Structure formats: C-alpha cells, structure tokens
Amino acid sequence: MQDTLDLKGTVGQFLHEYKKALWDSYDDEDMRRDATFMDHYGSAQKEGFGIAMKKGIGSVNSNNQRIFDTDIIVYRYADVLLMMAEIENALSGKCANYVNEVRKRAYGKNWHPQFAYTDGSYADNELTILHERDKEFVWEGKRWFDVVRMHDANGKSLAFSVAANYPNNETPDERVPLIKESEAHKLLWPIDVNTLNNDPKLEQTPGYDK
C-alpha cells in the first residue's frame, strides 16, 4: 500500500475496525469525515470497503521525521456543547441549538440550514446527541461511556439499544444492541484474578465467575 497518509514508514496506518455504517452516517458536506478517515477499497470493482483513520498521526518536520505533536485531548468545546445538549434533554429542555452549533463548525463553508437538527422527543434527541458525539469524538475514548450513561425513554442504558449501535460490515441489514439484556453484567468490568488473589476480601463483580 502506498504511503497515502504520508507516514514516512514510521508507524503504519491506524486500521482500527470502524464500521462502514459510521462512515455512511456522515453527510458528504461534513468535513469531519474526510478529516478523520480515508476510505479505500480492495479492488477496482469497489469491493472490500475499509477506512483508515487519519487522527493523531502528527506531522513531518524539515528533517523528514514524523513528530507526534497532536495535543492530548481531554475535553473540547464541542464536548461541552454536547454535554449541555444532554443536560437540556434530561431536563425536558431544548437541545437543538447546542447540536447545531457543533454541526455548523463541522460543516464550515458547506453549512446549510438543511443540516440543522430540530428538537424531537426525548428518545430522538438522546440518539441524535449520541450519534453527533460518535462523529465528533472518533478515537477519543468516549463512546463506551456515552452509551452506558445515556438512556432511552424508559430509562434503559443505550448500551442495550439497537438504534444506538451500527450494523456490521458483513451484515448491514442486521442490527443488534452492543450488549444483550441477558448479559447486563458486562456494563461493569470484572476484577482481574491477580487482584482477587492478593485480597481475599474482594468479591468478583456479579455476573463473572471468580
């Protein structure tokens, strides 16, 4: 494969397994998509779709060396806006303005009112905020905490929601939740065996064998 990302042979491409459905969820006018991913196919027949991530690869200096000078992301302004959207939705308020402020920056010169979100039901708003976070915070370690924290209209974690997940590349018409309700214990991590052995008073997280 050619060095399309200009990595200078230092680390290779970030070929994490991001689903095509996530790529497809971006509008063509949303500049985050092409700033985050590079799409590629396995053949001229457009088969074997895949995406390589372009985030966090740094830059090349005058000595032709790759420097990882990307800031370590903790919280960004877009995160604050979407937190506010989440809070407003929880309080039965209006969240669309916060979502649209994030989108306006993301679309830049491509922005058009047709891309604006209009407030809907609690469940619709919650899913919209989640999917906006999905597109905004790729590779930033937030997705799992988002789906566990956020809820549907019945107060159930979005980790159990089919609508919150993306279909697999191999079965694009089949949608399943991230976690089955029969495996609800997976919302919490198990305690590793070394820690349990070192402290006999510890008890394993319910749902896992000790």
Regions found by a protein language model. Give the residues of each.
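Acidic/polar-rich alpha-helix caps and helix-coil junctions
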Residues: 27-210
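Polar, glycine-rich mid-to-C-terminal structural blocks
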Residues: 1-17, 22
